[in-house]
Amino acid sequence: MNNITISESIKYIGVDDTTLDLFESQYIVPNGVSYNSYLILDEKIAVMDTVDARKTKEWFDNLDKELKERVPDYLIVSHLEPDHSANIQLFTEKYKEAKLVLSAKAKAMLPQFFNIEGLDERCIVVKEGKELDLGNHHLKFIMAPMVHWPEVMVEYETTEKILFSADGFGKFGALSHDEDWACEARRYYFNIVGKYGAPVQTLLKKASTLDIKMICPLHGPILKDNLGYYIDKYQIWSSYQSEDEGVLVASASIHGNTKEVALKVVDLLKEKGVKVAFTDLTRDDMAEAVEDAFRYSKMILAGATYDGGVFTPMEDFLHRLQHKGYQNKTVGLIENGSWAPLANKVMKDMLTPMKNITICENTVTIKSTYKDENQEAINQLVEEICH
């Protein structure tokens, strides 16, 4: 167990997973992930969520170590996604008198995951603002539907002023790996929670009324210092503002010719002092490309024509942006095609339904390979995207 100190009465009992290759079977996690769980020791004892089934033994070992032969009274179920709920059934079988504290939606969904004997008698359903008295500690329940599942709730511990934020403020990366918070928190947010900006805004508004001294998420580090920094990031991300002025250049090239043009654009932008990120959609992490698309204020797409459409990595990228609510951006288009270039039309058609997307009037069409005659169109696109 990570040697993490929260307070004398509140213990960390979570587990690192450093061998997981794909989170949610799609997001690469080179530095692993943490499944966070907490224990409040008072006159009554509350366990805050469980962990993924991959780490059942370690979690129960951590729990038993901190309980010191005491028995939990409550299991708080903030979120039913299996990486946090997998051990609910085992918990109820081991601690037969313990109650499950959860939202009405979570109780309705629970039988879809588990067959818990005497479920009605085991559950305490809580509503907005309800408080659970543990003795010196009190948990206030705040409903957070669609952050990012419908049953989610967060908890505010009123004595030590701790927000248990469920998946909010989470990040990729095991706690044993020390790294900057923002990068992997941003990638986590836009790929996991990003579609649900409005519910996140609602939760942030509720949280703004609380005196929060610490944030304990279900993934990633416990946040104690400079909480305004993390909250400001979430305000920006959930309101679909651009975090940085700059341009993401995203290339989907079959034989390298489209990528060559995209890299020329990158060089021109850098010469103008523009902050630039480049992604090769055929090879780079797609989740990181999504992250950067939301991070920067502008984007240039360079896509090859393929089967009468656009090369599939670009199509996949744009579908992901559609699903995640991409909006409030300026986008430039570059296409390549040897006999019937159609990529710009397809990319434009995919972008048009997105909210508040401005597509540059100047576009670039390459016929197979870059020629000097293409430079003027490239220059015009770069000038437009810079203004």
What name fits each language-model region?
Residues 4-8, 102-152, 196-202:
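Metallo-beta-lactamase
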Residues 219-244:
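Terminal amphipathic helices with adjacent charged low-complexity linkers/tails
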Residues 48-50, 72-80, 100-103, 163-167, ...:
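Active-site neighborhood of phospho(di)ester-bond hydrolases with catalytic His/Asp-centered motifs
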Residues 250-272:
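Short, charged N-terminal beta->alpha structural module
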